[in-house]
Amino acid sequence: MNFNLSRISALQIFQLIRFSTLILIGVVFSKAGLATSEIGQYETFLFLAGAVSFFWLNGLIQGFLPIVRGESNSAKNAQFFSIFYLLLIFSFLAAGFVLIFEQSISGLLLNGSDVPFLKYLLIYLLVSSPASLIEYIYLVQNHSRKMVVYGIVSFLLMFLLVTLPEVFGKTIEYSMAGLVASVVVRFVWLLVLLFRYSTPIPDVAFLRKHLKSAAPLVFSMFLSGSAQYVDGFIITSFFDEATFAVFRFGAREFPLVLLLANAFSASMLPGFANQSNLKTNLEQIRQNSEKLGRTAFRKCTGFQ
């Protein structure tokens, strides 16, 4: 079946698949009879990984989208590999931070509990953040259907590797190993795409330009997104992992409009790489934002 799928719709579908998978994993954990404390270990693992990476990861990705050259250039360039190197450096710094301050994190932020599955966490930090570049490579290259197919396959694999151990009565450690295995597979696929669309030589001029544009975004992301982590650390500092699991499940929601709006915002950024099309891009933003607003309003009223 041939159908047109825009970059906006593709990224929105991808983000919905990603978030839905995380919710479904939690549902399977609770239905499989997993102890609340073990679910708390899983939630703490993801929480810590997000806390040390969310701001620089989102800021660096949002910063490179408006300046990277995409599918209009037939020759390979070094830009994708350059941002990959940058993400890899920050990933090593995040993993090093957790490793160096493990005891402080345990004593001050986890109520004396050990950092859950530290070895898995370090591997996860090293590979998961760079792997987040995949969907944006597809976005910049305007490969919408490939992005959706990748989202379905990768998150189905993640769902199976994380939940099947619990279905068969294994401990939570097997699920954590499955989670890490799923992001390692994504990391390998990232390398395949990088060698397909880029050259492994750092573009220093591009990196300077990128860091200059991304620095305020990283700071902004840190300020705007830190509230949820402050709330979480208040719970982990005074209560055990079982209580944190209850808190995470109780505070969890399905932010449909926010997911659609964020995906829309990110999908429009590559258009600004070509300043000659600025007027056209602004008109597309106006039209698509009106469409998104009408769609979001109908869906929200339908849920009342």
Question: At which residue positions do the language-model features occur?
Answer:
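Signature of the first transmembrane helix
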Residues: 2-62, 95-99, 159, 215-241
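Membrane-interface helix-capping segments at transmembrane helix termini in multi-pass transporters
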Residues: 33-44, 70-82, 92-122, 126, ...
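Transmembrane helix-bundle signature of multi-pass secondary active exporters and lipid flippases
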Residues: 42, 46-54, 247-266, 296-303
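Membrane-interface junctions at transmembrane-helix termini in multi-pass inner-membrane proteins
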Residues: 127-149
